[in-house]
């Protein structure tokens, strides 16, 4: 768990790292309270103080500062049209070719450095030449292979791109950062084949137009701008062929190649975390399930003045094609230039949403990529995207988890240890070294909720402090953590990371204490949980 959390506390862009579409529209005249609840859940936090409420003057300045025109969506300059290898054999051939190429690259690099005048690159360079395996030539081989095969392998690469460079080697982090920014897109004939297989030969009757070149290309699919016959602008996500059938082999092939470099820390992908990752990837390949998740979130946040969820276009919804309203705004990593008050407000809303997802809805979108959160300055709203990794949490888990967070917020180390055992995070038979490291990790991550007054996310060294504990946590763990925590901690770490990136000051303790009291009040009697969602093997329920 803390291995994943410690590595995630670093900048990330996300799989759709481009501006998308048009402004969402203003909320209308008059004063507004910018809260994710629009009701009693956290109403008192919108009144005053850093990270709480904005006055009319703040909102006026934000609207005056908005761009005159929302930028048109566009692909990365590095993206190119390239056929997706759809069969397992063709995908394996790409990984085999990569392994051979990397080996030859190592020999060439070692030969070059053994010649007179050959030496490791200085500190001022790119840093890639400091490892023969991760030379510039080999880096290019890895980038090209992952951008060609796409799918689960590229998804893992994008996940590793957000690791702290003290967590994996800086050279490898640099490679995966390039991977994140330059996914390729499939050629027209391959895209049309998927559309015909999913929507039928008459698919064009469902739309007035569909741009042939996508405006975003990600690990699992690419997104095209379209227009319905009623004039509604839509984003149509089309899945690459063969991706869903190659998840397990892709992950194993990529990790086998990377282990050649010894660049990944031992234990980074334990068996249990690999199983959880593969399950999440299978969910993300089921666009019908994603449509149901998006509809669920749209209903849960229907009255929310700050967050919006685009509507699903059900006539463009199949297992490998998903149509939704075209959304507008810029990813969170492009919001650093906003005023401190606006950055505080955005991050306050993100943290509030995380707490609501876990402890009110018990249903969370677990992908923390910044491109899944588009901020529109014209309306002071954030649009939520990409619901493929959404999942539910049972009350037994949340009952224990909220007590672990409460113990950390209260600074009670003994209680953290006991509640972690109640959560089945620990067995009770761990070594003292492991127990101490676990408690310390919980206390570090609980600091925002333990701090009186606004917590300065921009001043911490959370990633480095967690990193120092990882060797002990890997060496002495007796049992895998609860399955729910893999995705949950990735999302929470991503939210903390966004707050750090935007240098937010937020009164987190008051926010959590209110959440805690409302959670237990809602459990007497039991509050209804979010509706059941289709999982692998379940029948599809129309999201409408």
UniProtKB/Swiss-Prot annotation:
A motif (KxGQ motif) lies at residues 155-158. Residues 54-67, 75-84 have a biased composition (Basic and acidic residues). Pathway: Cofactor biosynthesis; ubiquinone biosynthesis. A motif (AAAS motif) lies at residues 216-219. InterPro entries: ABC1_dom (IPR004147), ADCK3_dom (IPR034646), Atypical_kinase_ADCK (IPR051409), Kinase-like_dom_sf (IPR011009). Its EC number is 2.7.-.-. Residues 191-423 form the Protein kinase domain. It is a single-pass membrane protein. The chain crosses the membrane at residues 92-108. Adopts an atypical protein kinase-like fold: while it adopts a core fold similar to that of well-characterized protein kinase-like domains. The KxGQ motif completely occludes the typical substrate binding pocket. Nucleotide-binding opens the substrate binding pocket and flips the active site from inside the hydrophobic core into a catalytically competent, solvent-exposed posture. Atypical kinase involved in the biosynthesis of coenzyme Q, also named ubiquinone, an essential lipid-soluble electron transporter for aerobic cellular respiration. Its substrate specificity is still unclear: may act as a protein kinase that mediates phosphorylation of COQ3. According to other reports, acts as a small molecule kinase, possibly a lipid kinase that phosphorylates a prenyl lipid in the ubiquinone biosynthesis pathway, as suggested by its ability to bind coenzyme Q lipid intermediates. However, the small molecule kinase activity was not confirmed by another publication. This is Atypical kinase COQ8B, mitochondrial. It comes from Homo sapiens (Human).
